């Protein structure tokens, strides 16, 4: 069976409306006897009653196993689904509908295929509800696979992560630039304005010469010699 472009286009349109609507397996499958099951290849030990521990930034692969119990051929043409709230079934995030194969499953036969899912969700608890789209003769139907409880966690951040180191370097450089700017505009002026002014030391003045007492109250050099002789002769008497 060869799918035309119009069928692929219809697949995407149906996926967008069907995924957002409440799950109604009876209405979706039209009561076709087509059994769908899957395992998560990264967690093969996880069963439908367990909780899968998933990590953001990684990808998981759903390995489908389908069995056609009808008396006519059925072709798997696409995959989709959603992550729902496990408490009330409301859709939190839709999975992008994507074309598959088509994978022809003859009457009474089995087949397998893989759906890859990139994880980029808000860390929370979810119910993973995959869907597959099948072409039955001229009809396009979707089949709701079982739900899988899952917890999505964020990837732990390493201190040696290159992106984190780059952001830290940018942050430190920015803070350093701001501090230098503040210091250059206000800090330097404040420090210069409050710094104590050093007093200049004065040179000690040389001591004045001390006059030696000679018993005279005046300098006799300017007195005429005759006057001095006269004064001495008076003292002799």
From Swiss-Prot:
Residues 1-20 form the signal peptide. It is found in: Endoplasmic reticulum membrane. Keywords: Endoplasmic reticulum, Membrane, Signal, Transmembrane, Transmembrane helix. Residues 183-237 are cytoplasmic. It holds the Pfam family TRAP_alpha. It comes from the Eukaryota. The keyword Signal applies. GO terms for cellular component: endoplasmic reticulum membrane. InterPro entries: TRAP_alpha. Its main location: endoplasmic reticulum. It is a single-pass type I membrane protein. Residues 21-161 are lumenal. The chain crosses the membrane at residues 162-182. Is probably involved in a pathway contributing to genomic integrity. Belongs to the IRC22 family. This is Increased recombination centers protein 22. The lineage of its organism: Eukaryota, Fungi, Dikarya, Ascomycota, Saccharomycotina.
